[in-house]
């Protein structure tokens, strides 16, 4: 139990520390309502080249492809969507953890790490979904904020 609390505290602190990284964001960053950050807990570094898929639940209750991306050198993906397309609904972010660990020569337990969340049900918001990965576990957290003016 203490380990999980410490892990979540570490993930949250890494999320805020990583904002200090020398990432140059364009003026369009304020228009980025969904951002993803992925960290490698084993190496203590950003998880580079993690494939990420975003799905939106349809009225027929099926998951429809919404967006895709791959983490950059900072373990981040910006501009997965824009304000106009990112409406109210249920979304799933799927991290391809198997391919990430396999490329590093590690045989992981999980094929994917999924985060399912409801977006914009209380008004327009911006979401940062952060994932801390290891071969046999993962932890996620989210920062939900009002859009930047």
Swiss-Prot record:
Subcellular location(s) per record: Secreted
Residues modified as 4-carboxyglutamate: 64
Residues the record lists as binding L-thyroxine: 37, 76, 139
Keywords of the record: Gamma-carboxyglutamic acid, Hormone, Secreted, Signal, Sulfation, Thyroid hormone, Transport
Disulfide bonds: none
Any single biological process term in GO: purine nucleobase metabolic process
SMART domains linked to this entry: TR_THY
Glycoprotein found in the keyword field: no
Keyword Transport included in the entry's annotation: yes
PTM statement from Swiss-Prot or TrEMBL: Sulfonation of the reactive cysteine Cys-32 enhances the stability of the native conformation of TTR, avoiding misassembly of the protein leading to amyloid formation.
Family, similarity comment: Belongs to the transthyretin family.
Subunit structure: Homotetramer. Dimer of dimers. In the homotetramer, subunits assemble around a central channel that can accommodate two ligand molecules. Interacts with RBP4.
Function: Thyroid hormone-binding protein. Probably transports thyroxine from the bloodstream to the brain.
Protein known as: Transthyretin
Natural source organism: Monodelphis domestica
